[in-house]
């Protein structure tokens, strides 16, 4: 089973929005305000297979709010796996700065959002290469959950201008299935 918890009590309508998404996906949503509330809610749902914690979208330059969010998220415990969500439309220098600012959170991977809103993702590739962080998921539209997908090398390469993916080689190598994220050996050629 899946559960969602939001700590976003800052943005107007945030709670209603996440509850709507939860309703669409058939996932129960809990709202918390403090680290203690988060700890108790996680403990209450300890039988869940997956607990997703929605956070406040904060500026990487707001040190006070980031420290507060980090303090609250510490209640998730050491087993929590944090993913940083970044928009594909963000310029490379701002993306790299955001990744640096969020490093104290010890995030494991990056979720790239709004891939459908840009034709160029060199900024994403540059920032991720500099920070040595993998992409875990991408979003490619407004539909939830249909437009969320696990990141695959093939999909990322198809988004790069000037690259084409040799589908015949991929089908030959993987039997028609797309490669899994852990297999980064997809062949791409410059066109």
Ranges and model annotations:
Residues 3, 53, 78-86, 103-145:
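Conserved beta-strand/loop subsegment of P-loop NTPase cores
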């Amino acid at each position: 089973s899946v559960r969602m918890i939001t700590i976003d009590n800052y943005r107007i309508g945030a709670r209603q929005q996440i509850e709507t998404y939860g309703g669409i996906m058939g996932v129960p949503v809990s709202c918390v305000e403090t680290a203690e509330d988060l700890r108790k809610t996680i403990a209450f749902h300890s039988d869940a297979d997956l607990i997703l914690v929605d956070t406040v979208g904060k500026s990487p330059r707001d040190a006070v709010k980031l420290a507060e969010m980090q303090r609250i998220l510490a209640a998730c415990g050491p087993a929590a796996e944090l993913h940083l969500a970044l928009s594909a439309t963000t310029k490379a220098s701002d993306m790299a700065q955001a990744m640096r600012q969020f490093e104290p959170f010890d995030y494991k991977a990056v979720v790239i959002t709004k891939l459908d809103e840009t034709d160029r993702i060199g900024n994403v590739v540059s920032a991720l290469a500099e920070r040595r962080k993998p992409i875990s998921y991408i979003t490619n539209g407004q539909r939830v959950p249909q437009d969320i997908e696990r990141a695959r090398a093939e999909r990322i390469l198809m988004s790069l201008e000037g690259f084409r993916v040799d589908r015949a080689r991929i089908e030959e190598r993987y039997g028609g299935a797309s490669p899994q994220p852990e297999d980064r050996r997809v062949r791409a050629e410059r066109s």
